[in-house]
Amino acid sequence: MWFKNGVPTLGELTVESVAGTTGNTVITVSPKPIGGHKLVYKTAASTAPSVAYDDDLSKWTEFNNGDEITATNGHKITVAEVTADGKARKSGSADVVSGE
C-alpha cells in the first residue's frame, strides 16, 4: 500500500498490449498481483477508464496476466489490481493493439 500525507494512494501498473489473433490483444502487466489480489480490465474508445484507490471494480472483467482478450485496435484499456472484493489497489493503462 502506498501513502501520501498519511492517506492510502493508488499504486501503478505497467500495462502492455501486443497483437494477438484477429480482433484480440495479449495484455501483460507488471508487477504481478500480490497474493489474494486479482487483475481486472475495462476498455473505452477514446479515454482510458480512470481509477482511484478503493474504487469498487467488481463489475470489471477479470483476466490472468498474459491472457488474450477481445479488444478493438486503437481503443484504450485500463487494468487494475484489486482485492478479493474488487477494491482498486493499483492501475495502469495502454493503447490496445489488436491482431488484424
Predicted regions and their residues:
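Solvent-exposed loop/turn segments flanking beta-strands in beta-repeat/beta-sandwich domains
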Residues: 32-52
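Extracellular recognition modules
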Residues: 1-3, 76-82
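Surface-exposed, short loops/turns at beta-strand junctions within beta-sandwich domains
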Residues: 63-76
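Short coil/turn motif common to extracellular beta-sandwich-like domains
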Residues: 18-29
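Solvent-exposed strand-loop boundary residues in beta-sheet-rich modules
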Residues: 6, 44-47, 83-85
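Extracellular fibronectin type III
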Residues: 85-100
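Short beta-strand segments within Ig-like beta-sandwich modules, predominantly Fibronectin type-III
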Residues: 53-64
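Proline-enriched interdomain boundary motifs that mark the N-terminal boundary
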Residues: 8-16
